Amino acid sequence: MSQQTTIRKLAELVNTPVEKLLEQLAGAGMKFSGPDQVVTSTEKMKLLGFLRRTHGKSDVSVGTVREAPKKITLNRRRLQEVTVNAGRNKTTVNVEVRQKRTYVKTPESEYHTPTKPPIELADAERVEILRKLEESRQRNLAEQQRLAEVDRQRVEEQERKRREEEQAELERQKTESRVVEEILVKTDSNSVKPVSKPISEERTRALPRTVRPTPAARPSVSRSDDRNSNGGVRHKPRGSHVIVSDEDDSARRFVGQMHLTAAERARRGSNTRGKGGGSHRGATHRGNENSIRSSGAHGFERPTVAVVREVAVGDTITVADLAQKLALKSGDMVKALFKMGVMVTITQTIDHDTAVLVSEELGHKVTRASSSDFEDALLAHTEEVHGEPVPRPPVVTIMGHVDHGKTSLLDYIRRTKIAVGEAGGITQHIGAYHVETPRGVISFLDTPGHAAFTSMRARGAKITDIVVLVVAADDGVMPQTKEAVQHARAAGVPLIVAVSKIDKSTADPQRVKNELLTESVVAEEFGGDTQFVELSAKTGVGVDALLDAISIQAEVLELKAVIEGRATGTVIESSLDKGRGPVATVLVQQGRLKKGDYLVCGTHYGRVRALFDEVGHQPLAASPSIPVQVLGLSGVPDAGDDFVVVDDERLAKDVAQQREAKRRESRLVTSAGNRMEDILAQMGKGENQQVLNLLIKADVQGSLEALKQALVALSNDDIRINVIHVGVGGITESDANSAVTSKATVIGFNVRADASARKIIEANGVDLRYFSIIYDVIDQVKQVASGLLGVEIREEIIGVAEVRDVFRSSKFGAVAGCMIIEGVVKRSKPIRVLRDNTVVFEGELESLRRFKENVDEVRNSTECGIGVKAYNDVRVGDSIECFERIEVARTL
């Protein structure tokens, strides 16, 4: 480039249009009339500075004088010593406080508006360029004013928040200083004696934490901000750094470490020193902060007090879950339970009372947790009233001793022949029927009379309105008759006595009335309130009178129920049908049960797929007091469970699952207790007790329950009946595998094994027995149990000889001259020598003679000579017992 450079030539050098270069020169405050004018070096540098400022770069170039800096940052360091209390001693800590302040210079362009270049009216193009430049400058100025206003509002908002925080900080510091003084006073006073009163968690939480500078409260001006700033003014808010006093910082650390043990504080202190570096890094802020922590960490080593926790526990909880709630190790929880005498593992379940005791022993509190949300929702469903109660049919339960004619009476009323088809001629499950009579509909429940079906009869008495007690006129009052009276009284149900079999020649109805007087059942003719009806189920005599008595009693009771709305009731019997699945016989007590309803039944739920009455018809709905069979449940419910109809399947499923979880936890608690009881029992009884494992499958739930109770009751000190599994339905492959594993006897009551189960049973030699009568089950189990007991060896004395004289023999030694005073003495049997009724020797005969002849036996009132083998101390007056050992089969 030559010394004289024109605007046109400069535009060619920088590859910029001439018009744009003229605009840039005008923006830099230099006026030129045309592109042929000369541009000096000073004007070039001024244009370069303008362009740099426009594009956000510093106006610095080689060969020019550096302008004054726009920002100046001052750093100040101040060292001070802090004295920290460490128990009885005091420790001095060096603290370095750093302060940084930045001053920003405001450009003159914001205070002085650049003068407008004169406009030459002759040059129209220059006028247009200057007009555009003026508009651009005005827009930039308006934008800068808007941004300045936004910054001003933001600064005012930050200032307002800062003042509020300072006011709150003053209040917190007052509280902190007061509480810390109390803590330090207590700490100094307790340096000799142990801590007597723990600091509560609430008080610890009340301590304010030291406010540290946050990014929002301390905006720092970094080097990148200096380089990238567009000239805007950024003020640093006051109060962005809060100087923390030594006393407040040490008190904060002391409060934060109250829950740590001495070992944990030492370990934390060492980790802090390691992370912060050594003393050579103490000049840095992080190293200084960590050095303060590590120097004060050992200053408050005090005995700590355990935190008292309050946890909510339901009816049951596992040991591991309770330990987790109390923030303890599971092993420590097990040790605490062992000390209390409860031997459990971490996976076992304990009840609520045990959890309360062990938690109080460990210094914690336990409250009862409510886990019945779904049950409450279900209760709200049942409490809703759907309509006015209207009269309903009575529910009558037929009870009495076995073979007294209960089912025969129902057969005559229903015109059926059920008793003929029952196994053994006895009823072994509850039968539910409803009969339409001239006097209205009556629902009958036929209960078993065998002693094993006590729980069945108890359930029948609870859900009934009237109990008809059937007593045979020729047999009188029997044990199950007395039991039926007790069930009726326990349920508060009126009693009607039906004296059956009056057509027999040996019938004595008066005897029945007299015997029932001992059970406080007084007939009306004797001044009581119990109706007695004499009848015969064979001839039909008196049956109408019984129906009249039932109708009269029902009118007196004024039985009513709501017949619309959601149905509720009770399960009478349940079974597992191979083709239909779980089947439950239910008695509706309120509302109307319809097909498609969702219901909860114990731990099972489902949707009613079909309804069947006792004759196999499918009614559209079941009203109160009507028994029906329900199909569609998820499992076989227990007899006696209540059912409730709900709106949706979700609620039914939640309630059933919650009940199943509670039952499982309760079963775990019971089984754990039973295991410990079994261990202690085995320790006391030794190894003599035999165990008979049984696997029982039955057709209905009621029979299964009765079988289990009757068989378990056979256990005694010599043998224990252990029922490993019970279930409703046929014997499956899994049942057979369980029997093989546990070496159990399989009992099928009115059920059979399928093909796969039979194959496993035959291959492994499992004892499988089928029954249809409960008497046979009990007798067979007794025989099997007796076989396990083996035989018992008994000793039976067959003869006694009295020693009258003693002779000496060179061959046998001492020979006793005896008189047989009882029984017979045989040579092949063992003997005992008694002196003053005390056994002095037990052995065998070496010689038995009479008149110097060897004989095999000597009978009563006969003299003989007895030589005792290997015993020569026989004396006059001794007694010699001859006995034999016999084997006796042991029975239950």
Curated annotation (Swiss-Prot):
GO terms for cellular component: cytosol. CDD domains: IF2_eIF5B, IF2_mtIF2_II, mtIF2_IVc. One of its GO terms (molecular function) is guanosine tetraphosphate binding. Residues 144-176, 189-298 are annotated as: Disordered. SUPFAM superfamilies: Initiation factor IF2/eIF5b, domain 3, P-loop containing nucleoside triphosphate hydrolases, Putative DNA-binding domain, Translation proteins. It is found in: Cytoplasm. Keywords: Cytoplasm, GTP-binding, Initiation factor, Nucleotide-binding, Protein biosynthesis. The keyword Amino-acid biosynthesis does not apply. Residues 207-219 have a biased composition (Low complexity). GTP binds at residues 400-407, 446-450, 500-503. Residues 391-560 form the tr-type G domain. Belongs to the TRAFAC class translation factor GTPase superfamily. Classic translation factor GTPase family. IF-2 subfamily. One of the essential components for the initiation of protein synthesis. Protects formylmethionyl-tRNA from spontaneous hydrolysis and promotes its binding to the 30S ribosomal subunits. Also involved in the hydrolysis of GTP during the formation of the 70S ribosomal complex. This is Translation initiation factor IF-2. It comes from Xylella fastidiosa (strain M12).
